[in-house]
């Protein structure tokens, strides 16, 4: 048994009887992609690779070609005159090549190209870029065309139509992927392909004279694209642990993916979409940003299929489960064959630290989803022209982007020794900010709340990832990560629904969401203290939960 010190809530306790990272059991076959640890290698300057906790990586069979460290200068023929235009073109080509090499070097750092993380980075960037381009495409219609009352009523109706199926399907995505041997890459590509079809439908129904879309087409397509974006996040979470390089942990992997998505997807993709939208709208009366969406989604579907095949391997995995029942016939991991012989199925309950971090992150996600939709309706209800409304929303969006980037930058450098404690503190901070914004009822208070909420959400998510990596055995880590992401997206949907349904007065909206945050904070604190307000879904479980069998009394420990 663990000592009392190890069972303290929020502390990462050592795992009794768990396979070590240095053991041969956990050594993944992908280590064949890294340099051999022989005598000549030890004498070299490069240190030997760290042992890996990722068992999904198979050998590629060949070493990648060494990348070019510099771009060779472009030479000119003798007697050729270099004009100002030609010099500018050469300089632009050289700068572009250097920028490409810089991005490629960052994307392949720490062995990411061998583990498959680089292949996953590009679809993640494409997903961020699609969201940013869609925001540009819909900005003109939402802020310069539709009436506020019409927007509010129709969005509430279509939100119910599109979000309700997602709320039912999202909890089933994780278990379905656990049972499928082949389907993760296809599911990722399908999330892009369906968005391509929706963008084409919007383009076909675009009215160039008014610069708008029919309401019955606009809102279902826009909300459905949001649902597919969230579905991509859930699907990606089940793939990420399988492409984790051996030299970095899950926290750094997710922070890297988010930073790449923000810089290469949200900022670069949004800027390109804005430029194309401006040119196409003024010259051709066409929705240029939607053409960018079509191009990015097609590229994203293709890039998703280039993710390594070993992400499909699920043999030997034990699915994770949110619930915990003490009276079930539990079975330690050294007796899996007895369970299979008797027809039972092993399940890995989440430990106390994980469930506490999950409740805290869900509470924060409610606030994030609320801030995603509610400020748009508040700005639309404001008695001002479209540019002022767009400026109000731009302030909130900038605060969210800065907070998200700062949170991911900070979380990658934090020592997450007690992640559950950090999650509780972030949840308290976000709840206090929501109450303060309800009292102030001003745009400045909303921007400050958005800034700190975005940063707190990134730090709390990194803490949840740290708990998942430490407190779950390797064979349940990918499943646990997918289950947690599904739950977080449902919490986001709940917050977005509150933002659509409540009245467009700042103090009213923040009062409504504060009531939900207080309930979530109470469950988080109670779970942290080892109890629960909801039976079976709280912290009344050990820090390191043993595996259970779904068949009550199906297996008995051998004598």
UniProtKB/Swiss-Prot annotation:
Database matches in InterPro entries: MFS, MFS_trans_sf
Stretches assigned to coiled coil: none
UniProt key word Membrane: yes
Any Pfam family matching the protein: MFS_1
GO molecular function, one term: efflux transmembrane transporter activity
Basic and acidic residues: bias regions: 1-10
Predominant localisation class: membrane
Topology of the protein relative to the lipid bilayer: Multi-pass membrane protein
Transmembrane domains' residue ranges: 128-148, 155-175, 186-206, 208-228, 259-279, 283-303, 358-378, 387-407, 428-448, 490-510, 515-535
SUPFAM superfamilies: MFS general substrate transporter
Disulfide bond positions: none
One annotated GO biological process: response to antibiotic
Gene3D superfamilies: MFS general substrate transporter like domains
Annotated region described as Disordered, given as residue ranges: 1-76
Record localization: Cell membrane
The entry's keywords: Cell membrane, Membrane, Transmembrane, Transmembrane helix
GO cellular component: extracellular region; plasma membrane
Family of the protein in this entry: To M.leprae ML2143.
Protein name: Uncharacterized protein Rv0876c
